[in-house]
Regions:
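Conserved structural motif at the start of ABC-family nucleotide-binding domains
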Residues: 2, 20-23
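Class I S-adenosylmethionine-dependent transferase superfamily signal
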Residues: 24, 167
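ABC-family P-loop ATPase nucleotide-binding domains
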Residues: 10-15, 67, 72-158, 164-165
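Conserved catalytic loops of ABC-family nucleotide-binding domains
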Residues: 169-180
């Protein structure tokens, strides 16, 4: 279960404070996937970023005893001067047990299908290559909840099919928190 209590999130704008949420209370049940659907700017992605710990509310709290992924396929957090392998190793050190480190790196290397680019700096990657690496990294770890903000597959038809297969496998044991318009 994920419980949100009295959560407020706002941003400063030239015309004053814009509230995305004000005293939001919601409970997301365990074992259920939830889709947040709404117009652009409604706060769907902001809510998922806060649930995933990427953004913080102004006030209130998010309570859970479940593991929650970062947004699936998120490629914006990579360090450009490090190689794909080095970036994956950094994340794996945070989320994996020491004895799983090699396995996680090998999984992402195989999944992303970047070949020699896996050992090149990420700043040399195309956006599609970054997305493949990000998606592979997301699938390397098992979470109770996966955050899915719009894009769930990248690349050609075969790679999209591969991504869909992994999504189905993860959905057997995990729940998804999804955003769509």
């Amino acid at each position: 279960m994920i419980k949100i209590e009295n959560m407020t999130k706002s941003y400063r704008t030239p015309t004053g404070r814009h509230y995305v949420f004000k005293d939001l209370n919601i409970e997301l049940p365990s074992g259920k996937s939830v889709a947040f659907i709404g117009r652009n700017g409604a706060g769907k992605s902001t809510l998922l970023r806060m649930i995933g710990g990427i953004d913080r509310p102004d006030s209130g709290k998010i309570i859970t005893n479940k593991t929650i992924s970062w947004p699936v396929g998120l490629a914006g957090g990579f360090q450009g001067s490090l190689t794909g392998r080095e970036n994956v190793k950094f994340v794996a050190r945070l989320y994996a047990k020491p004895e799983e480190l090699k396995e996680k790196i090998e999984f992402v290397e195989e999944f992303a299908e970047l070949g020699k680019y896996f050992d090149m700096p990420i700043k040399t990657y195309s956006s599609g290559m970054r997305s493949r690496l990000g998606f592979g990294l997301s699938m390397a770890f098992k979470f109770d909840y996966y955050i899915v903000d719009e894009v769930t597959a990248v690349g050609d038809a075969r790679f999209k099919e591969k991504c869909a297969h992994y999504f189905k496998e993860r959905h057997k044991e995990s729940s998804f928190l999804m955003v769509s318009h």
